């Protein structure tokens, strides 16, 4: 790649991170987490926005839009906004220990929020219902995290 192309990419990333261009966009997601059919209370969830246009961690890291924990019924409801030049790509991250035994760290997987559930503005106009999510199974792309 030429030095001008690299310089251009760095410049675009720098300008985007200055937060004076782009538009505020929002998303919301709700659902119910269960472990072997029982409410998974206290499970940490985050609503994130993907900034991996050029590959993971290149120029801009993913933005945290909201975070919280599942209530005593395993239910969660997150809503947040972020400023981006292009359309946002929100997703839910779930950190849990269901069926994990004494394995260190937590199991982590993500659920994408459909683009049709995003909008311009600082508050979400509709909420994506992820339904009941059973944590006992293994999810595609599931990883582990000790830092969350």
Swiss-Prot record:
Gene3D superfamilies reported for this sequence: 2.60.40.3330
Subcellular location: Secreted
Record keywords: Glycoprotein, Secreted, Signal
Top-level taxon of origin: Eukaryota
One GO cellular component term: extracellular region
Signal peptide bounds: 1-17
InterPro entries tied to this protein: Transthyretin-like, Transthyretin-like_sf
Residues glycosylated per entry: 77
Similarity-based family: Belongs to the nematode transthyretin-like family.
Name used for this protein in its record: Transthyretin-like protein 2
Organism: Caenorhabditis elegans
């Amino acid at each position: 790649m030429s030095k001008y192309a690299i310089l251009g990419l760095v410049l675009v990333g720098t300008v985007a991170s200055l937060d004076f261009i782009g538009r505020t966009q929002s998303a919301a997601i709700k659902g119910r987490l269960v472990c072997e059919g029982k409410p998974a209370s206290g499970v940490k969830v985050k609503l994130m926005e993907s900034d991996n246009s050029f590959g993971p961690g290149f120029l801009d890291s993913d933005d945290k839009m909201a975070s919280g924990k599942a209530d005593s019924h395993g239910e969660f409801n997150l809503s947040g906004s972020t400023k981006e030049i292009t359309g946002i790509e929100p997703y839910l991250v779930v950190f849990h220990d269901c069926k994990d035994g004494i394995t260190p760290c937590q199991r982590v997987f993500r659920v994408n929020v459909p683009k049709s559930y995003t909008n311009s503005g600082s508050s979400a106009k509709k909420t994506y219902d992820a339904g009941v999510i059973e944590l006992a199974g293994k999810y595609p792309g599931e990883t582990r995290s000790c830092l969350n």
